[in-house]
Design a protein with these regions (language model features):
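A short glycine-rich, Lys/Arg-flanked "PGG" loop and its adjoining helix->strand segment in the class I
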Residues: 173-185
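C-terminal lobe and adjacent flexible extensions of AdoMet/dcAdoMet transferase-like proteins
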Residues: 266-331
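A short SAM/SAH-binding and catalytic strip from SAM-dependent methyltransferases
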Residues: 159-171
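Catalytic cores of eukaryotic secretory-pathway lumenal/extracellular enzymes that build
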Residues: 130, 170-176, 194-195, 199-204
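Conserved class I S-adenosyl-L-methionine
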Residues: 188-227, 231-234
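Conserved N-terminal segment of class I S-adenosyl-L-methionine
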Residues: 2-151, 291-293, 298, 314-331
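A short acidic, Gly/Pro-enriched loop at the edge of an enzyme's catalytic core
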Residues: 149-159
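SAM-dependent methyltransferase
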Residues: 218-289
Length: 331
């Protein structure tokens, strides 16, 4: 464990396994962070605590392909800021000088908002999407790491934020416990999760077409998946667009079409933007290695089991589960 004298002033990384403080060193011209026993490479100014190739590779490709698509600064919209505000459920001005951990940052759609409001931000992602985020936010402290083996001190962050990630981890409940470990007592945990209901876990006609397409897509070699998904998307998107004003036809289409189509749920600017956002999220939903669903009750029960307080969870406008909890001072 880290000695008490380091607890408040140390701002760097620790070994994910031993919690020893890591020091930067140069070996044969290459930079590393190292402890007594372990060392981790720094590549393109980003510390890497995982193998560069892992189950999140498709996400890494996705966020490099769509590096700016969902950035408010690029779209001219406030979609990401509004979602962040809704999940955190606090004034974003309260983020100023707060030590915030963003778990699963992708290309940085929320990173730029957190930085804008003055958060002392640390971000990480399992995939090499961290490189896209670093390009979008050059001053960001960021690393490539696993949510189950994070290189951070325990009881350190004021706020831990995890949006769009837990459902893609091997064990969402264990991931929540790990997030709580690095959160200060009385700190704020803000998370979301895919919602468990019949439509999300059964095949058509009760469920959606994603149930049928995804297992087939995952059988395809990773390097070919995007091309296949784009062909599927390009077939279905014109049909969705033609009937974009009919909610009834859109409901029918979801039983046979696997694509995401946001005309009735997001106020995007034009057809190209609907196309780009739809293709991005269609790729996301068809290539995720893990896909879990939980009810509000399941999430709340697990947080109660971990002695969290002020637990506030609900079904969000996009039909997911999201909310906040306060870490117990006595955990």
């Amino acid at each position: 464990m880290i000695k008490n004298k380091y607890k408040k002033k140390f701002l760097g990384y620790v070994c994910p396994f031993t919690k020893e403080i890591l020091k930067k060193t140069c070996i044969n011209g290459n930079l590393f962070l190292r402890s007594y026993k372990n060392k981790y490479p720094i590549i393109n100014e980003i510390p890497r605590f995982v193998e560069l190739k892992n189950y999140a590779n498709d996400f890494g490709f996705q966020w490099k392909k769509f590096r700016k698509t969902q950035l408010d600064s690029f779209s001219g919209l406030t979609v990401s800021e509004e979602r962040l505000q809704r999940v955190l459920n606090i004034p974003l001005t309260d983020l100023k000088k707060k030590k915030v951990l963003e778990a699963g940052c992708g290309s940085g759609r929320f990173s730029e908002i957190l930085l804008k409001y003055g958060a002392v931000l640390t971000s990480f992602d399992l995939s090499d999407a961290v490189e896209s985020n670093k390009l979008n936010n050059p001053s960001l402290k960021i690393c490539q790491a696993n949510i189950l083996e994070m290189p951070f001190q325990n009881d350190y962050f004021d706020i831990v934020l995890c949006i769009g990630v837990l459902q893609h981890t091997p064990n969402p409940e264990k991931s929540i416990e790990k997030l709580l470990e690095v959160l200060k007592p009385k700190g704020l945990l803000a998370i979301d999760h895919y919602r468990r209901k019949w439509r999300n876990i059964l095949p058509p006609p009760i469920g959606t077409a994603t149930f049928l397409y995804r297992p087939i897509i995952l059988l395809i070699k990773s390097k070919y998946r995007f091309k296949v998904i784009k062909k599927i998307f390009d077939f279905w998107f014109p049909i969705h667009w033609k009937f974009r004003k009919s909610k009834f036809i859109q409901r029918l289409l979801r039983r046979i079409s696997p694509i995401h189509f946001y005309f009735n749920s997001l106020n995007l600017k034009n057809k190209k933007m609907f196309y780009d956002w739809g293709l991005l999220d269609t790729h996301d939903s068809l290539t995720d290695f893990y896909k879990h669903h939980r009810t509000v009750k399941q999430i709340v029960s697990h947080l109660q089991y971990n002695k969290c307080q002020q637990i506030k969870f609900y079904i969000n406008p996009m039909d997911g589960v999201e909310g906040t909890a306060i870490k117990s001072q006595n955990k």
